[in-house]
Amino acid sequence: MKTAVLAALLFTSTLTIGTVAAQPAPYNEIGVTMGHWHIISKDVEANKKLFLGMGGKLFMPGGNPLMMFPGIYINLNLGTEKGDGGTQGSVVNHVGFIVDNVQERVAQWKAAGVPVLPGNNNRLDQAFVETPDGVRIEILEDKTQSMPIRHEHVHFFLPEAELPKAQAWYAKTFGGEAGTRNNAPVVDVPGGQLRFAKADTKQAPTRGRVLDHIGFDVRDHQAVVKKIEAEGITLDEPVRKSPTTGNTVTYITDPWGTRIEIIERAPLGALVQ
């Protein structure tokens, strides 16, 4: 896990120096870093208020609301589409942040109007936040980190026989480092960890749900697309450049139903809030 540890240290040092918050973690060797969660909000303003209350920063690239936390962007709309169905019951069961002190952050968030659920079995080092339209966010604690909050993980729920296959697929496709956490398979990528847990029943694909897809930012879109196509992965749609944001994007879908955006991101513009 030396690569993942080094990336985490570089990421932390970049943020503690106080440089612009709107930066993902440094790219890995193939030019990939954790990118975003794309929420198709039924109530954009409610979600904006929630994430601002948790310490997020708001940008408006191309006139679209984009929240930023260390290690992750969160898109709050997708044109005129509205998602149906929360994360639970889909292959991406939940996503996660890690904070320096759960109880202190929970108190601050509640004061800002963020609804917070207790941890499992009333654990004091864990909590949950759920968006108004059902995106479940796990909150964990690392008292050694120097920032109040950062992105930590995306948690996939899959049939047991598929767990090693999914781990291998994500490690190969995005240049991640395979490992284990609590005896469960994981893949470390800059800016976050992909975790894989057993589901007793087949879970629904993400497309069309409130968390419609996850995304990876890339340094060289053409090179990454060439790599994954050579590995037999078919693009869901042709590569295109957004006329409003300047981003270069395409989508793929993993073998288990997670929609994934691959994006080379243009500058975000000024911080709004």
Residue ranges and their predicted role:
Residues V5-G18:
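Bacterial N-terminal signal peptides
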Residues A21-I30, V106, K110-L158, G179-R181, ...:
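Vicinal oxygen chelate
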Residues Y27-G62:
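Mature N-terminal segment immediately following signal peptide/propeptide cleavage
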Residues M34, V44, K48-L52, V92, ...:
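Extracytoplasmic/secreted envelope proteins and their assembly/folding machinery
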Residues M34, V91-H94, H153, V210-H213:
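Eukaryotic phosphotyrosine signaling hubs
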Residues H38-D43, F97-D100, F156-L163, D217-R219:
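Short, surface-exposed ligand-recognition loops at beta-strand->loop->(often short) alpha-helix junctions
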Residues G63-A112:
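Mid-chain, structured segments of secreted extracytoplasmic proteins
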Residues E162-N183:
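Solenoidal tandem-repeat scaffolds enriched in leucines and small polar residues
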